[in-house]
Amino acid sequence: MGTALSVPAQTQSARVRAQGSGHTIQTAITIISIVLVGIALIPALVQMFLDKPLYYPDARFTIQNIVALVSDREVTATFGATFLFCSIVVLVSMALGTSSAILIGRTDLPGRSAFLAILLWPLFLSPQVIGFGAILAYGPAGLLTIWFSDATGLTEPWNLYSVPGMAVVAGIAATPVTTLYCLTAAIQQDPNQEAAARIAGAGSLRILFRIILPIMRPALIFAFIMNIVNALETLAIPLIIGGPVGIKLLTTLIYDKSFESAGLPQYGLVSALAFALMAIVGVLFFLQRLALRQSHRFVSVGAKSIQPKMLALGSWKWPAFLLMAVYVVFGVVVLVGAVFARSLTFILSPDVSFFDAVTLQHYSDVLSVEVYRRSILNTLLLAVVGGALGTAFVAAVAMVAQRSNYRYRRVLDAVAQLPRVLPGLVVGLGVFYASMFVPGIDLLRNTIWLVLIAYLIRFLSSGYGIVSPALLQITGDFDRAAKSVGAGWTTTMTRIVLPLSKQALLSCFVLLMILIIKEYSSAVFLMAPGSEVIGSTMLSLWTQGLAGPVAALAVMQIVLTSILTSIVTRILGVKLHG
């Protein structure tokens, strides 16, 4: 009897040991995650309450930096300009993105696939490239501005150097995100409701406004909030377009106060502004969660053996095609084309023949000047290494948070999503401070590895948003079956769960590579000889008036993104959309 009872006891003990075998790893992953996010937050938080830079031994406690948020006229003026900027960006992006998604995904518009491919270009381009292209094409001396003025006689047909002007450009840069969110929601709908409406005699417009758009409401809310967040965080477009004429938004004020040429940089005010920005973003994400709590009311789940029927545009087919073509050509192709053209000429002007101005000197400089070449190599290295390390770290975090019984898994889940509310400037500022005080990290100062840490913090939530849902879709029966034969948590994750999550992990890798190549704001505070990246180098060159090398670097950034994404998508079979 005693022997019979001891066998189950021993088996149960073995299973408990197997189940708990991953506790040390889970704890380590949790601690590393908290430390990384803490690096971005704590130093900047402390600086907000000091009257001098954090590294000054005589710095004293003060709340003046917080008071300045509501008392300083320069600061309060930026809130008004930022509100106007964000409003226009959201209006442009939502209007263009939603319309494009419906026309491409749910109508019989001619050339839908070609339009979608071109519409997504800005998704893979840094906002800096879009901004440079806008200045070259639509600035006061831009090609299209001069051509339009000559044709119509208008001396100033539009004003790019204004809050509405740069907001339209930023809205165009943000449109692909709205298009993707809405396109997926428009396509993946139960066709039975539309079929019933057609049987009842409803036409295309009635189906659109009474069925398709209401079901798309969660995607529209998500896109709306994301557009506001992106508008609040954007730095490059307001800096290169609004900076020369004195227009300041919240992000550009943070940038200016950090690099003041006269006097000491106001790091305390910078930290207060950064946390104000983070608080606004945090409130927006909270409102998004509230708005989407009842999102299931707008989703129909049914048999999808047939594809939703395309809405017939009828007599509006070719006018819609023309409007879409105008947007694609003048809102995307012209901007990218202007950058390519400027990279191949010493001057870009209607008064000078393109072929007379052709030169390869800018590319020669980019490939021969040490700083330019190093920024390209650093960006390539960070994209590949950062994408791989980031994916591995995201996978580890997601497995602990979603596929374990670890006591603090909910805390880890919250920590992993916290960087969503951290703008790139806040992350860069926090890592900058940490490099001066945190033992170990100070050894990485002025190296690309410090930039890599900032990137990993910045994009933790982005990767987590891809991998976490994929892990939740894998049944827990695999975990239970593995435990029944004595497999520990680590073995179960590495031998079963991770292989089943291959597609999500590859998608995460591609996304992180693209985001790292595009990123610039996190590296602004970390720029140093030897740690240059393409984004920060372009900003520096533009402020010096070197448009040619900037355009060549922008083209190199486009080419680098295209090559890496093409290789990965073709070899690994990852889909970039759909």
Model-derived regions, located:
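A short amphipathic helical element positioned immediately N-terminal to and/or at the very start
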Residues: F61-V70, L208-F209, S258, V358-L367, ...
